[in-house]
C-alpha cells in the first residue's frame, strides 16, 4: 500500500517527542533526520511559550541547512518559522483590555499571573512557588516587574494563572463566570490555569499553516499523547497517539504506536508512514 504524502509532521514534546528524561532518543533523532532530508517540515507543537520550545528546535537544527521547521507554541496561539528572522507565520493574541482585566482578577483572588517575553517569564510575583514552576518547566528566568499591565505593551498570546491546587476549582469557576464569551480559560495542570484567545487549538493553527503552504490535512501527520493534542490528531490526515496517551486521545487516532515515548514511539510512526 502506498504511503501517505506527508509534507508536515507535527509533534507534541513532553510525553511524545521526548522521553521521561526530556531527551530525544537516538532512533527518534535518526528518523527525524531522514524525514527532514526528504523535505518534510517538522512542527514542534507545544503549550509552552515560543522561547521554551526554541532550545529543542536548535537541538534538531530546524531552520538550518534546508531542514524545514516551525514552532507551534501556546497550544496553537502562535506558529513561528525556525529559519532566519523567526517570522511569525500565524498567531492569535488576547484582546489588549484582557491583560489588565486578568491581572486585576488575579490580584482579587490573591494568586500569581504570568506572561512571556524574550527575557523570560514576566510576573509581579517572581518568588511565587507556583509561578516559579513555569520558569523551571521552560528553563526560562523569572522576570519581576512592578506593574504587569504597564510592562506588557506588546501582543500577548497567553497569560497563565498559577496557584495552589487547592484553589484551582474555585478560582477557575470565578474566572469562567467573569470572562465567559471573551477568552478561553482551562486548567493545564493542577496548579496552572491557561488564559488564551477564544478558539485557540493546535488544529486551527495547523490548518492555517497548511493553507499558507498550499497543502491539505492529508499532507499532515500529527503525534501526541495529551488532551491538548486531541484536536490535531483528529484533524490530521494521519493522527498518531502514543502508546502512553490518555484514552480520549487514542480514541481520536488513526494509529496508536506499539512503543511509548520512552521506546521510540515517534520513530515507529515516522518509519511506518513517512520513510
What are the roles of these predicted feature ranges?
Residues 105, 109-223, 227:
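Conserved acidic, metal-coordinating active-site core of Asp-based
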Residues 60, 67, 75, 179-181, ...:
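Short, structured coil segments at secondary-structure junctions
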Residues 59-63, 88, 130-134, 202-203, ...:
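Short, hinge-like loop/turn segments at secondary-structure boundaries
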Residues 5-21:
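Asp-based phosphoryl-transfer active-site loop
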Residues 39-43, 68-69, 158, 218-219, ...:
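Short active-site oxyanion
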Residues 3-8, 25, 194-275:
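Mg2+-dependent phosphoryl-transfer enzymes with acidic/Ser/Thr/Gly-rich catalytic loops
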Residues 26-130:
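Active-site phosphate-binding/coordination module
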Residues 28, 53-57, 171, 175, ...:
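Hydrophobic packing residues within well-ordered alpha-helices of enzyme cores
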